[in-house]
Amino acid sequence: PVLEMDINLSSDRQIAADSATDLLAKLAQKYKQHNISDTPYLVLKSDNGTYGMGVITVETPDDILNLNRKKRNKLSKGKASLPIEKLILQEGVPSVHSTNNMVSEEVLYQCNGATVGGFFRMHPTKSKKDILNATGMVFKSFCNDSHALCSSEITACGVAQDISKT
């Protein structure tokens, strides 16, 4: 759900926590139905795009109710220091890939339905439930030709070069 709220108001955090309770219950039911052994979690983020800002993971509704000042500040201003007035509460999807011994995710660019590029976003200190779009992230391009250069556990494609500094 999209929530119009001020994260600094305890009454608005209560509304978000209630939504989190409902969503986590629905997800737990689906996880059980599909024999998923992981515990569901949520992501609370700005509805106005993030660039990695204004995003936190939520494991329980109490995480929202008990947000400390630092996390409330993180969720109160977004891109260009504009106030965040709408937050999205959505299912968290853990990263399942590991590249160069780091948790990684594929980032794909598409144009008119065709994939035109992409890369791995990796982070040396984050877990599979963390947001990888954060300070310290590393980028690696997909292989263009031979898999001899691959350093990925993914057999379909891997890593050719470090593009973090390009």
What name fits each language-model region?
Residues T135-T166:
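Conserved catalytic alpha/beta cores of large enzymes that bind or transform nucleotide phosphates
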Residues S10-T21, P61, E153, C157, ...:
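Generic detection of long, well-ordered alpha-helical segments
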Residues V2-S10, D47-Y51, R72:
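A near-ubiquitous, low-amplitude feature marking generic local secondary-structure context
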Residues S19, N68, S127, D145, ...:
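Serine/threonine-rich low-complexity intrinsically disordered regions
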Residues P1-D38:
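Conserved N-proximal alpha/beta basic substrate-recognition cap immediately N-terminal to
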Residues A25-A28, H34-L42, N48-F142:
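Phosphate-binding site of ATP-dependent enzymes
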Residues M5-D6, L89, A160:
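Generic low-polarity alpha-helical segments
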